[in-house]
């Protein structure tokens, strides 16, 4: 028997063990490239336990973690997208919607809830980036306006977590109209002297960054979030120059006065509760 035949059984055993490892058990950090136990990363709110890199967090998971346990209640869940333009690119818009709904379990890219943070009542919304890149369409705009109205009715702050590539191409002008619609709604919130806190997460781009996302009484970002209008590659190709290191990242924007603060994901609930109480002049 040759040496290769002697070690062949052990090679087969290792291969069989690898086959028995369930899919999705492990993941890799895109920053430090550490191999991580998936359940541990989920418990840590998609923050790498090795290098503290903030990975993308789903909209529903974000809101459920943000609110005090058991206080979050979804609102406007009945609003669903329609294909008013009968739009078709590579595939029909209806097909894209159905595929995104099946993949994410969400009806559209924006989720709104009422709840409490550290005992303080708030209305909050969050984007699901996995739903067509968190794109802003007519459903998002309608749910945003309803969230504003809910905050006015309850006399409480509005907090929105943005994670979007921008306006939804398949809805054309209906999508672009949401930039004006959401911005106008914030005017009503401001007239009622209620705070709007905008939390910019990775990525916040396009029509979302060019409208309500930058209109917060405080504009707060997570660490290393990509924030801007056009992407850095598009800008480099247009101006034909190399962009500065960290351009469009939250630290760069804070240094240049475009945002107010950077807050670690684990501290958002405590910090925002404190900020909202101060703005509302309420004691803990």
Swiss-Prot record:
Organism: Hydrogenovibrio crunogenus (strain DSM 25203 / XCL-2) (Thiomicrospira crunogena)
Name listed for the protein in its UniProt record: Acetyl-coenzyme A carboxylase carboxyl transferase subunit beta
InterPro entries the UniProt entry points to: AcCoA_carboxyl_beta (IPR034733), Acetyl_CoA_COase_Trfase_b_su (IPR000438), ClpP/crotonase-like_dom_sf (IPR029045), COA_CT_N (IPR011762), Znf-ACC (IPR041010)
Superkingdom assignment: Bacteria
Primary localization: cytoplasm
Matches recorded under Pfam families: Carboxyl_trans (PF01039), Zn_ribbon_ACC (PF17848)
Record's subunit section: Acetyl-CoA carboxylase is a heterohexamer composed of biotin carboxyl carrier protein (AccB), biotin carboxylase (AccC) and two subunits each of ACCase subunit alpha (AccA) and ACCase subunit beta (AccD).
Subcellular location: Cytoplasm
Involved pathway(s): Lipid metabolism; malonyl-CoA biosynthesis; malonyl-CoA from acetyl-CoA: step 1/1
NCBIfam families: accD
Domain CoA carboxyltransferase N-terminal, residue spans: 25-284
Cofactor: Zn(2+)
Free-text function comment from the UniProt entry: Component of the acetyl coenzyme A carboxylase (ACC) complex. Biotin carboxylase (BC) catalyzes the carboxylation of biotin on its carrier protein (BCCP) and then the CO(2) group is transferred by the transcarboxylase to acetyl-CoA to form malonyl-CoA.
Enzyme class at the top of the EC tree: transferase
Keywords linked to the UniProt accession: ATP-binding, Cytoplasm, Fatty acid biosynthesis, Fatty acid metabolism, Lipid biosynthesis, Lipid metabolism, Metal-binding, Nucleotide-binding, Transferase, Zinc, Zinc-finger
Gene name of the record: accD
GO molecular function: acetyl-CoA carboxylase activity; ATP binding; carboxyl- or carbamoyltransferase activity; zinc ion binding
């Amino acid at each position: 028997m040759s040496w290769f035949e002697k070690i062949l059984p052990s090679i087969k055993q290792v291969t069989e063990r690898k086959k028995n490892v369930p899919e999705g058990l492990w993941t890799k950090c895109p920053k430090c490239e550490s191999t991580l136990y998936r359940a541990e990363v989920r418990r840590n709110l998609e923050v790498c336990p090795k290098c503290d890199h903030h990975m993308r967090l789903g909209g529903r998971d974000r809101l459920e973690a943000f609110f005090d346990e058991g206080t979050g209640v979804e609102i406007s869940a009945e609003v669903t997208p329609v294909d008013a333009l009968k739009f078709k690119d590579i595939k029909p818009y209806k097909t894209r919607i159905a595929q995104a709904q099946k993949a994410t379990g969400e009806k559209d890219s924006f989720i709104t809830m009422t709840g409490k943070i550290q005992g303080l009542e708030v209305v909050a919304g969050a984007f699901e980036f996995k739903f067509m890149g968190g794109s802003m369409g007519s459903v998002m705009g309608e749910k945003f306006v309803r969230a504003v109205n809910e905050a006015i009715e309850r006399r409480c702050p509005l907090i929105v977590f943005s994670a979007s590539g921008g306006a939804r191409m398949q809805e054309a002008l209906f999508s672009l109209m949401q930039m004006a619609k959401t911005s106008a709604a914030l005017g009503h919130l401001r007239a009622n002297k209620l705070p709007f806190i905008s939390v910019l997460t990775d990525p916040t781009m396009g029509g979302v960054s060019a409208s309500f996302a930058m209109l917060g009484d405080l504009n707060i970002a997570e660490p290393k979030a990509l924030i801007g209008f056009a992407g850095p590659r598009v800008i480099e190709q247009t101006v034909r120059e190399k962009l500065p290191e960290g351009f469009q990242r939250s630290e760069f924007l804070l240094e240049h006065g475009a945002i107010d603060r950077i807050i670690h994901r684990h501290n958002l609930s405590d910090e925002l509760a404190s900020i909202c109480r101060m703005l509302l002049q309420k004691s803990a």
